[in-house]
């Protein structure tokens, strides 16, 4: 039966007006259930409804339309425990739901305090969209809670496909002075799309994607998606082994991949299966992914992120990406992701001017804009922004089990005058150019990551001589495990581009990196940046015909793998792709089957496999990467023959001799000094016939006698192939 209530209680007209405009800071003070001397006042916001009833214990009480879509009634229950709202819509459709405005806040005081202090290390558990279940007297209620930080907003509402994107149905409340807006909405399920309608202090109204969204629509669509993980991990053994490993003293050979163009058309799971096979066949220990966080513009390669907490939906769901990582772990392959905390794009629907003011970006244009890229720079000194980023680093490690973060564009963060004209930057409090807030942020990120995740590696793309990038934070360093050695990359590629007859005049270019090889813990990169924008590829940088180019690439890679430091190679370079990389098409795998040059490409691919296998087998190539004691020159100055040679030492006492002939002529009886006499086995020869070389070599080994040479007590005559490399191991 239906009982007509004796009176309808209308709220203050000013409150109704604010509510109708989506600008009320506490809609829960109007909507929901409120005590009254004669019972309980129930109010509901149903702007398009034809009728609304409150259903209490099987009895329906009609609500009166008060104004602006607000319905209300006084019901004769002083201690109302529960009720439902029955809504009749145009066309006669009726639904019954719980009232989201009668639920307590989903964030506790401690959570809000920690966020306000910038110290909530699991921020993703309190902000964003979270599915919830409540057991109430009238039955179970399920739905989604939403929480977003927008301290300067005049009002925030949840909008989505569940309300026709109207923005009138679900205004949120602000929790105290934190600037966090919150609301629980019954009935919203995993997969539903949503945004926040944010009313700025300037009168602007913008529909914003959730900064903490765990999933998104497929670009170019921009909505956030409610997401719940049901994935069950299978990599406990991998994680335990990782925690017991010291990255600097372990083998690390990284294959850099842009997912969309490695083999186009694959999803996360298909890519994981095919990548695992390729990486196992080539022997890489890790894969590094260009940014996988959601980004609207594919041409940015992922470096203009709009949803920092969501793997791109181009290839599947967040659980599909979890499967991707899990599958590679099962194959014995670590996963590193590129992370972009330096800047973010100006898309109006994303982080930019989120609450109508500079919020995530610095308010000073001289610190808040990256002029080269047309992007905004994070305000690293703001506690909540710093918390957003530090928690994001932890999120990828906790939620997706990734094994490392390669931090992009670190130099742009460290210097206030980075790429700025004279007079276009503001000094720090000491009058210097260092961005002290960014330094503190990087230190906090690295210290927190390493405290919580032993064995995880953080890598800096830092292109200047900033001191202490890989020094521990407790002694003033930035705290990274490794830094890209951009100087090595520049000098080595420049040297190899010279014709062999001219290389002797540029010998210093190939040896200079050993002057500073232990100033930081380095990773040697031949990355995506070196095979685009007219730079060519490894193959096309080499002088000569295809035979000479193949030999040059093989020699370069052997030098790279034996040089102190870990190594990274961008996809396609492992088989010598001749065309520059483009994100718009896949790799030229067909070159492996080319009837004329395919042998060279297959030979290079085989060499990369053998480089990685030999590298892993010989601790001399990786256990002392960060110590000068792991390296010793035999001869760095043989410019006449265009030869350089050095020794690598392992913590197990093993010794390798690495010899490189960068001239265009072989040396038949090249005498090289060695630390001990005896048999030195040839463990790698880049000119071997299996690599499409000439087969010039040493028949498997040379014997060192007691004849001193190069300041060493022993020596041997070695056959050095033209444009080639030889590695030898002392047999004891």
From Swiss-Prot:
Keywords of the record: Carbohydrate metabolism, Glycogen biosynthesis, Glycogen metabolism, Glycosyltransferase, Transferase
Any single GO BP term: glycogen biosynthetic process
Keyword Transferase in annotation: yes
SUPFAM superfamilies: (Trans)glycosidases, E set domains, Glycosyl hydrolase domain
Pathway given in the UniProt record: Glycan biosynthesis; glycogen biosynthesis
UniProt entry tagged with the keyword Membrane: no
EC class name: transferase
GO cellular component: cytosol
EC number(s) stated in the UniProt entry for this protein: 2.4.1.18
Record field: catalytic activity: Transfers a segment of a (1->4)-alpha-D-glucan chain to a primary hydroxy group in a similar glucan chain
Residue intervals passing through the bilayer: none
Active site (record annotation): 408 (nucleophile), 461 (proton donor)
Molecular function terms from GO: 1,4-alpha-glucan branching enzyme activity; cation binding; hydrolase activity, hydrolyzing O-glycosyl compounds
NCBIfam families on file: branching_enzym, PRK05402.1, PRK12313.1
Family: Belongs to the glycosyl hydrolase 13 family. GlgB subfamily.
Subunit structure, as described in the record: Monomer.
Function description: Catalyzes the formation of the alpha-1,6-glucosidic linkages in glycogen by scission of a 1,4-alpha-linked oligosaccharide from growing alpha-1,4-glucan chains and the subsequent attachment of the oligosaccharide to the alpha-1,6 position.
Protein name: 1,4-alpha-glucan branching enzyme GlgB
Species in which this protein is naturally found: Rhodococcus jostii (strain RHA1)
């Amino acid at each position: 039966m239906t009982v007509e209530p004796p009176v309808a209680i209308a709220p203050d007209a000013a409150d109704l007006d604010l509510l109708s405009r989506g600008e009320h800071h506490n809609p829960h003070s109007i909507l929901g259930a409120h005590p009254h001397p004669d019972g309980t006042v129930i109010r509901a916001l149903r702007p398009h409804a034809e009728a609304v009833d409150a259903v209490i214990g099987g009895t329906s009480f009609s609500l009166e339309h008060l104004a602006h879509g607000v319905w209300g009634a006084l019901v004769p229950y002083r201690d109302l425990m529960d009720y439902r709202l029955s809504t009749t819509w145009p066309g006669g459709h009726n639904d019954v739901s719980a009232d989201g405005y009668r639920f307590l806040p989903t964030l506790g005081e401690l959570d809000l305090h920690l966020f306000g202090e910038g110290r909530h290390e699991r921020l993703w558990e309190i902000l964003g969209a979270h599915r919830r279940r409540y057991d109430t007297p009238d039955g179970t209620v399920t739905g989604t809670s939403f929480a977003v930080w927008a301290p300067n907003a005049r009002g925030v509402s949840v909008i989505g496909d569940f309300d026709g994107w109207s923005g009138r149905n679900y205004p949120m409340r602000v929790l105290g002075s934190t600037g966090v807006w919150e609301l629980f909405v019954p009935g919203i399920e995993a997969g539903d799309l949503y945004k926040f309608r944010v009313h700025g202090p300037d009168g602007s109204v913008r529909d914003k994607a959730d900064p903490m969204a765990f999933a998104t629509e497929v670009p170019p669509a921009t909505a956030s998606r409610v997401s719940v993980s049901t994935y069950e991990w299978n990599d406990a053994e991998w994680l335990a082994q990782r925690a017991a490993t010291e990255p600097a003293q372990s083998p690390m050979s990284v294959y850099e991949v842009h997912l969309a163009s490695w083999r186009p058309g694959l999803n996360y799971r298909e890519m994981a299966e095919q990548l695992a096979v390729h990486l196992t066949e080539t022997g890489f220990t890790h894969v590094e992914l260009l940014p996988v966080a959601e980004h609207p513009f594919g041409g940015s390669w992922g470096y203009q992120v709009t949803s920092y907490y969501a793997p791109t939906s181009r290839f599947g769901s967040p659980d599909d990406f979890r499967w991707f990582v899990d599958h590679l772990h099962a194959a014995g392959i670590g996963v590193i992701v590129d992370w972009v905390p330096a800047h973010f794009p100006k898309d109006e629907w994303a982080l930019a001017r989120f609450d109508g003011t500079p919020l995530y970006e610095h308010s000073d244009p001289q610190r808040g804009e990256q002029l080269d890229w047309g992007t905004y720079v994070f305000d690293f000194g703001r506690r909540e922004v710093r918390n957003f980023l530090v928690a994001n680093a932890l999120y990828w490690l906790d939620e997706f089990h990734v094994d490392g973060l390669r931090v992009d564009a670190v130099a742009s963060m460290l210097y206030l005058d980075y790429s700025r004209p004279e007079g276009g930057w503001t000094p720090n409090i000491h009058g210097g150019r260092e961005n002290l807030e960014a330094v503190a942020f990087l230190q906090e990120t690295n210290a927190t990551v390493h405290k919580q995740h032993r064995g995880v590696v953080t890598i800096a793309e830092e292109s200047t001589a900033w001191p202490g990038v890989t020094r521990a934070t407790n002694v003033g360093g930035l705290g990274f495990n490794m830094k890209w050695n951009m100087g090595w990359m520049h000098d080595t590629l420049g040297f190899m581009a010279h014709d062999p007859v001219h290389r002797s005049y540029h010998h210093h270019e190939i040896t200079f990196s050993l002057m500073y090889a232990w100033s930081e813990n380095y990773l040697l990169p031949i990355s995506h940046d070196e095979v685009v924008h007219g730079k060519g590829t490894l193959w096309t940088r080499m002088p000569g015909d295809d035979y000479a180019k193949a030999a040059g690439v093989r020699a370069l890679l052997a030098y790279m793998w034996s040089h102190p430091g870990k190594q990274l190679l961008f996809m396609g370079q492992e088989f010598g792709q001749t065309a520059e990389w483009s994100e718009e098409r896949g790799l030229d795998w067909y070159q492996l089957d080319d009837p004329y040059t395919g042998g060279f490409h297959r030979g290079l691919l085989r060499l990369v496999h053998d480089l990685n296998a030999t590298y892993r087998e010989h601790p001399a190539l990786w256990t002392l990467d960060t110590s000068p004691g792991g390296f010793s020159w035999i001869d760095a100055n043989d410019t006449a023959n265009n030869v350089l040679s050095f020794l690598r030492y392992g913590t197990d006492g093993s010794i390798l001799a690495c010899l490189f002939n960068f001239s265009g002529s072989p040396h038949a009886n090249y005498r090289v000094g060695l630390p001990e006499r005896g048999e030195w086995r040839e463990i790698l020869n880049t000119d071997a016939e299996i690599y499409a070389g000439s087969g010039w070599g040493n028949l498997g080994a040379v014997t060192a006698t007691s004849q001193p040479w190069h300041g060493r007590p022993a020596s041997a005559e070695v056959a050095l192939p033209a444009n080639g490399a030889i590695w030898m191991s002392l047999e004891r």
